[in-house]
């Protein structure tokens, strides 16, 4: 199960499609600008 937008994460691979884990605090899945 992937992490949704604003879900806590440690790596981008945990996040759902089009989301990436933020590089700096706070660490959560944010939109990576892709469609």
From Swiss-Prot:
Q: Which domain of life is it from?
A: Eukaryota
Got any disulfides in this one, which pairs? 2-16, 9-21, 15-29
* Gene Ontology molecular function, alphabetical: ion channel inhibitor activity; toxin activity
Q: Where are the transmembrane segments?
A: none
**Annotated signal peptide:** none
**Entry keywords, A to Z:** Disulfide bond, Ion channel impairing toxin, Knottin, Secreted, Toxin
Write out the coiled-coil annotation as residue ranges.
none
In which tissues has expression of this protein been reported?
Expressed by the venom gland.
Q: Name one GO cellular component term.
A: extracellular region
**Main localisation:** secreted
The answer to whether keyword Secreted applies is yes
The record's InterPro entries line, in alphabetical order, gives: Huwentoxin-1
Q: Give the location in the cell.
A: Secreted
Q: Which family does it belong to?
A: Belongs to the neurotoxin 10 (Hwtx-1) family. 48 (Jztx-F5) subfamily.
The UniProt function text for this chain reads: Probable ion channel inhibitor.
Domain note for this entry?
The presence of a 'disulfide through disulfide knot' structurally defines this protein as a knottin.
Protein name as annotated: Jingzhaotoxin F5-21.66
The lineage is:
Eukaryota, Metazoa, Ecdysozoa, Arthropoda, Chelicerata
């Amino acid at each position: 199960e992937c992490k949704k937008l604003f879900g806590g994460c440690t790596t981008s691979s945990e996040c759902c499609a089009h989301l990436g884990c933020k590089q700096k605090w706070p660490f959560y899945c944010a939109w990576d600008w892709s469609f």
